[in-house]
């Protein structure tokens, strides 16, 4: 994050670690941002998690509910928090980090795929609805990324810096130019 902030130069950032599924904490975070900066130009929705791989018939429904809350509802909550300020200014950008699993659905990934597919639907509808307010939406579909998201490191996956660079490019181009970015490591062969 520090490196990205330095690369972007004359920009103002505020970061805070909190439970994104807690609506009061989301609201408090946004209130702090409004007080500090007056508005929000870009929101990157990147919170998410995955559960163990299960067949659809074996999915723990409580785990699935939590996954929907984290991977979908929380991002929508953040959008709802900042949208009014963007709409008032007729300017802004939402960058929603989805997953390449939205482009195909593999066995044993039902919980994760369902929640990311739901967020993709919200994001595509938002793209159409936000157009009237001159607000852009960019959906990022990363494949495997070598982070602690997975239990085991895989140097053949995308580097986090690669994904961050694409997000940065999306933010820097003219408003409304980039709608979807698909990033896949060479190792993945489940292309739709």
Predicted regions and their residues:
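Active-site loop-to-helix junction immediately N-terminal to the catalytic Tyr of the SDR YXXXK motif
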Residues: 59, 105-113, 125, 153-154
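Residue(s) in the substrate-gating loop at a strand-loop-helix junction
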Residues: 99
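Substrate-binding pocket helix/loop in short-chain dehydrogenase/reductase
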Residues: 54-56, 63-65
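Active-site helix of classical SDR
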Residues: 79, 115
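The beta1-alpha1 cofactor-binding region of Rossmann-like NAD(H)/NADP(H)-dependent oxidoreductases
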Residues: 17-28, 61
């Amino acid at each position: 994050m520090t490196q990205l902030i330095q690369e972007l130069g004359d920009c103002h950032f505020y970061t805070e670690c909190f439970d994104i599924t807690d609506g009061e904490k989301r609201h408090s975070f946004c209130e702090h941002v409004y007080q500090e900066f007056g508005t929000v130009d870009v929101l990157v929705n990147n919170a998410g998690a995955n559960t163990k791989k299960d067949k659809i018939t074996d999915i723990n429904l409580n785990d699935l509910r939590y996954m929907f809350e984290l991977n979908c509802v929380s991002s929508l909550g953040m959008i709802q928090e900042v949208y009014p300020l963007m709409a008032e200014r007729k300017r802004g950008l939402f960058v929603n980090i989805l997953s390449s699993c939205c482009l195909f659905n593999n066995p044993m990934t039902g919980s994760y795929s369902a929640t990311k597919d739901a967020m993709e639907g919200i994001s595509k509808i938002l793209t159409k609805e936000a157009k009237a307010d001159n607000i852009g939406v960019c959906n990022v579909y990363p494949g495997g990324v070598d982070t602690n998201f997975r239990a085991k490191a895989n140097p053949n996956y995308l580097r986090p810096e690669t994904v961050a660079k694409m997000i940065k490019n999306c933010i820097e181009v003219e408003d409304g130019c980039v709608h979807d970015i698909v990033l896949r490591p060479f190792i993945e062969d489940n292309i739709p």
